[in-house]
Swiss-Prot record:
Residues 320-495 are annotated as: Interaction with host IRF3. It is found in: Host cytoplasm, Host cytoskeleton. Its main location: host cell. HAMAP family: ROTA_NSP1. GO terms for biological process: symbiont-mediated suppression of host cytoplasmic pattern recognition receptor signaling pathway via inhibition of IRF3 activity; symbiont-mediated suppression of host cytoplasmic pattern recognition receptor signaling pathway via inhibition of IRF7 activity. This is Non-structural protein 1. InterPro entries: Rotavirus_NSP1. It comes from Rotavirus A (strain RVA/SA11-Patton/G3P[X]) (RV-A). Residues 42-79 are annotated as: Zinc-binding domain. Pfam families: Rota_NS53 (PF00981). The lineage of its organism: Viruses, Riboviria, Orthornavirae, Duplornaviricota, Resentoviricetes.
Amino acid sequence: MATFKDACFHYRRLTALNRRLCNIGANSIWMPVPDAKIKGWCLECCQIADLTHCYGCSLPHVCKWCVQNRRCFLDNEPHLLKLQQLKHPITKDKLQCIIDLYNIIFPINDKVIRKFERMIKQRECRNQYKIEWYNHKLLPITLNAAAFKFDENNLYYVFGLYEKSVSDIYAPYRIVNFINEFDKLLLDHINFTRMSNLPIELRAITQEYFQLSRLPSSKLKQIYFSDFTKETVIFNTYTKTPGRSIYRNVTEFNWRDELELYTDLKNDKNKLIAAMMTSKYTRFYAHDNNFGRLKMTIFELGHHCQPNYVASNHPGNASDIQYCKWCNIKYFLSKIDWRIRDMYNLLMEFIKDCYKSNVNVGHCSSVENIYPLIKRLIWSLFTNHMDQTIEEVFNHMSPVSVEGTNVIMLILGLNISLYNEIKRTLNVDSIPMVLNLNEFSSIVKSISSKWYNVDELDKLPMSIKSTEELIEMKNSGTLTEEFELLISNSEDDNE
């Protein structure tokens, strides 16, 4: 199962390029790191191990040994993991580049075999050869790859020798096989040519090769926000916005496309060595404003929200209530995006004003039938069930029929923020005292989408961007969000 790891250990002594490419963490000293309790293939050493999150993409795809090298397949440094990575769409020319890569880095010929035999004979307690001593020379070329599906057109494939099997239900990738996209007979011929140089007793690799090269492809898994680790998330207490640390190996050398990189691998190895020698481990601080985080935060908000506020007599915002056991939610909102906090305040204030204008209620300790609906309303924000839930909330406010249209009253005083929001939404000069269902629904939707345009939000964090994209966004100033001018300097807001 450690064929690829053993090959990296022995082949790194062949050339100067191999000394840099084949230096993987699995052949180094182990350092303790937290794991994600996910079993799968480490993409760097191709072993089945407990995976931990990568500092480059925040996804669990490296083992506890290889993570110390801080390499990601999204780097632009041409290390081995980067060279094994191809982006969708996959063509036959790209697959040929993978085959050329293995033939260059892990050659099997008479010269290499004699060199390894001399190295083995120099060791102690080697009275007879055993097949496992040659494990590093039994590396077949397969076209199996770990596929990362960020969306329909954004897929990455990391090729490697993935031996054995493991339940990868929680891993962010799936193993796919591109042998049909290449040529089965041609790939067999390439491997048989490599095997012909091996001693007769070692040619049993043929059976292992066929088992690995004919693996069926798994169904691709769509990556969601929950697959990304929380370890790289940083909450900015000044701007009150979440961000994410992204670490990448950055080199000043550039290649127009993947094919040009492999051309330099064959014809200009010194360029790759220079790129790896001059690369810098760079930290990018990016905002974490995406649809996945928005849905997660909305779910947590619905879990922690206190619907009793709509029946209360508190004059302040819902997020500022501290000493009421039925309405206090400040413990949760202290470290949450300020946009979610503002949305929660406006939404709860609006429902409170509408509810108390139409229903005879006591105070926040009252038990009202509308309470479960308010939680459902928050959970349904930005979903297809939003209209249905809004209508149910509206019907719980004792609407009356006027000329065949159900309406509710809005007669309580409004704070300035909600007053301006309703005027802007309804496009009126003065706030109406009567609201129908369409107007009520428009106001709720306007409040929820005040700070979030779902159509323009990325579905996943910025850590899935390539290094070139991160550099370009950093230079253009779009990598982070700045809201200092929108944040109050009052002591209460900065608690």
